[in-house]
């Protein structure tokens, strides 16, 4: 029996309205805060740190059941798709934490 699940979402974001790193960082900060507050997720910017119109975020959740992790990631993806930036390539993965 599994003791828990880790859900990971990787999302490429494009900020067509950002004209500087400062503007991009405002978008990224907002996205990270909202993902943490709404979904209880851990969030990190993992790529494109010095590119002012792109970012790659990795979002992680830990739950007791696979369905809950999958639902949280789907909700997080929908949230990212509904914002003022463009959502690019997205990947999702669920990993079980075995009792062994």
Segments (PLM) and residue ranges:
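Short, charge-patterned binding micro-sites
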Residues: 43-64
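Short, flexible active-site-proximal loops enriched in glycine and acidic residues
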Residues: 42-46, 86-89
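N-terminal first-folded block
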Residues: 2-42, 79
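Solvent-exposed, flexible loop/coil residues
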Residues: 19, 25, 47-50, 91, ...
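A structural signal for short, well-ordered beta-strand segments
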Residues: 9-13, 57-59, 90-94
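Residue-level signal for beta-strand positions within conserved beta-sheet cores that form or flank
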Residues: 39, 55, 86
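C-terminal structural segments of small proteins and small subunits
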Residues: 63-100
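Short coil/turn motifs at beta-sheet boundaries
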Residues: 1-6, 50-54
């Amino acid at each position: 029996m599994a003791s828990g699940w880790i859900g990971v979402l990787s999302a490429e974001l494009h900020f067509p309205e950002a004209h500087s790193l400062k503007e991009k960082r405002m978008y990224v900060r907002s996205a990270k805060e909202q993902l943490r507050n709404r979904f209880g997720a851990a969030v990190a910017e993992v790529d494109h740190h010095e590119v002012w119109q792109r970012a790659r975020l990795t979002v992680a959740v830990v739950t007791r059941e696979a369905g809950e992790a999958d639902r949280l990631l789907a909700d997080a993806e929908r949230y990212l798709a509904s914002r003022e930036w463009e959502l690019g390539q997205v990947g999702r993965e669920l990993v079980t934490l075995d009792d062994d």
